[in-house]
Each structure stands twice: as structure tokens, then as C-alpha cells.
């Protein structure tokens, strides 16, 4: 099971799933990452093992 947490290193609107995922894994030691709509814009969200 994965828990999601907004990226702490991504700035601005998320428009590239691949870059978001790479940044979550590389910089934040997450297992996965993707762009997800959180009002008012798409944000980079990182996924960790709970």
C-alpha cells in the first residue's frame, strides 16, 4: 500500500509525469510519483510505502 505526499522539491504546476516521478524517486527517496490534480492546479505527488 502506498501513501501519497505532495512533493517537497517540485515548484509550480506539474505537466510532466516522467519528470515528477524521477524527481520524487531521486530527490525525495519515494517509490513513485505522478502529476495529480489538487485544486487549483496539477501538483507533483510522491508515493511512499506506508
UniProtKB/Swiss-Prot annotation:
Disulfide-linked positions: 3-50, 14-35, 20-44, 24-46
Cellular component, GO annotation: extracellular region
Distribution of this protein across tissues and organs: Detected in seeds (at protein level).
The family this protein is said to belong to: Belongs to the DEFL family.
Name of the protein in question: Defensin D4
Function: Antimicrobial peptide with antifungal activity.
UniProt feature coiled coil, ranges: none
Domain of life: Eukaryota
GO biological process: defense response to bacterium; defense response to fungus; killing of cells of another organism
A Pfam family of this chain: Gamma-thionin
